[in-house]
């Protein structure tokens, strides 16, 4: 393992590869217990998570639903619940997969909040967009969509006195592949430290359909590049990112891209700068 790989892996608290099925099961139990402890320590009984249709929110949702189920069983308190929220922007192209994810999770409650009108209303008020290239406006509004989704989730959580779950994991964190104060904002991040193939392995452990587990990851935030795969944005594959984080050799170009991207996105992984 290169020293830089070791340093980054330590900073992101990357978990080692699952040695076997027992190790995977133990990690699932540890993360379910983590979620339960977060709720109990906060003296709250509701979890809220936006379900996009990707494997990250699918896996986080499965962990959350199991956590509240176990809390109900162990405490006898049926007030513990998990709310899955669909947050489409107008019409979502992969709505079928998103609904399939929600159906498989079987959350206690499911809500739908369309963020389209809110994002468009805000965009209409921003005079700074005047004269900007369409691609620049599209990129900025992509981040606005992510932040609006988090606003919606926190609004639901506030109404139900709950905590918001995030879906960030090590393979996204190392690339800074999240919107600051958007999908990067949450109360607890149960996938933290996992690489992408571990997130998929946990989804499979729950019996999730392979079509959802292996669905091509996409943030799908930009109207001018609908459904753009994450890997096209990264310039490297998730397999290469996972290998890098686990100290395995990767091609020279992938090593360079990951290290440079990690350095320039450091501000996204820190608290606001202060004097």
From Swiss-Prot:
Matches recorded under InterPro entries: NAD/GMP_synthase, NAD_synthase, NH(3)-dep_NAD(+)_synth, Rossmann-like_a/b/a_fold
Q: Which domain of life is it from?
A: Bacteria
Q: Does the keyword NAD apply?
A: yes
* Residues bound to ATP: 50-57, 167, 196, 218
GO CC annotation: what is one? cytoplasm
Specify one Pfam family: NAD_synthase
Secreted as a keyword?
no
Sequence positions that bind Mg(2+): 56, 172
Q: How does it assemble?
A: Homodimer.
Family designation: Belongs to the NAD synthetase family.
Q: What does this protein do?
A: Catalyzes the ATP-dependent amidation of deamido-NAD to form NAD. Uses ammonia as a nitrogen source.
Q: Which NCBIfam families match?
A: nadE (TIGR00552), PRK00768.1 (NF001979)
The name of this protein is NH(3)-dependent NAD(+) synthetase
Q: Which organism is it from?
A: Pseudomonas syringae pv. syringae (strain B728a)
Gene that encodes the chain: nadE
